């Protein structure tokens, strides 16, 4: 009984630690990070003859493709849009941007260091003076929400029909991947909490049964967590390979990778699976040992 209680206590401690790490991962924003400092240094060093890096603080305007004769409409189209704005605004003005020669080179697209999680995408503070100035002036926002709902892209009127359809389909698939990631992470946390409660109840009632049930719940939570983490990795790869590449892709000298939040999620997965294996295998091992000792006593008699 003492060994069984010790095993239950160890598995319960591991599951609670795993739950804390998973909740930390869910509510923090360092799942994926990009560092553009090396890209900026290369552009400043090798692209000094061009005006590429000046575009980081230069506003772009809606340029009408055809003069419709409507002065009010043309004036409305001249609203300034910064090149570091959201992807939808860059897509809106993609022809004007290409016409100005801003995206002819990799240095023409202004890139800033970012970190993102399940709910927000933010710019690093204090890493790039340009984006800090833009945020201070109110031109850019420090953080933007990650979309989990599909909205009709009414701003894509300046884009060819085939490219518009491609963007819409990619957006739809990406939203599905995001929903799967968030949904399975939520289920993993809920099942893990239920398993911890069942394991705690095992100290007072039917320890063998509750230990087995909690182990199965921990393994189920591990499956959910594995699905969500793999889906998140797929969504990141899918997002970086979207069209048009000058909006969604990253140059080769931009450092990007997973952050400490997803590391917490992977550690949580390991602890969850370990506690589940302990809780499910120990009852079988103890039962087998008891049967062997009983058989040995009967044979000796």
Swiss-Prot record:
One of its GO terms (cellular component) is endoplasmic reticulum membrane. Residues 205-215, 280-301 are cytoplasmic. Keywords: Endoplasmic reticulum, Glycoprotein, Membrane, Signal, Transmembrane, Transmembrane helix. The keyword Hydrolase does not apply. The keyword Membrane applies. The chain crosses the membrane at residues 184-204, 216-236, 259-279. It is a multi-pass membrane protein. Residues 1-25 form the signal peptide. Pfam families: Claudin_2. It is found in: Endoplasmic reticulum membrane. GO terms for biological process: negative regulation of osteoclast differentiation; regulation of cytosolic calcium ion concentration. Its main location: endoplasmic reticulum. PANTHER family: TRANSMEMBRANE PROTEIN 178A, TRANSMEMBRANE PROTEIN 178B-RELATED. May act as a negative regulator of osteoclast differentiation. Belongs to the TMEM178 family. This is Transmembrane protein 178A. It comes from Danio rerio. The lineage of its organism: Eukaryota, Metazoa, Chordata, Craniata, Vertebrata.
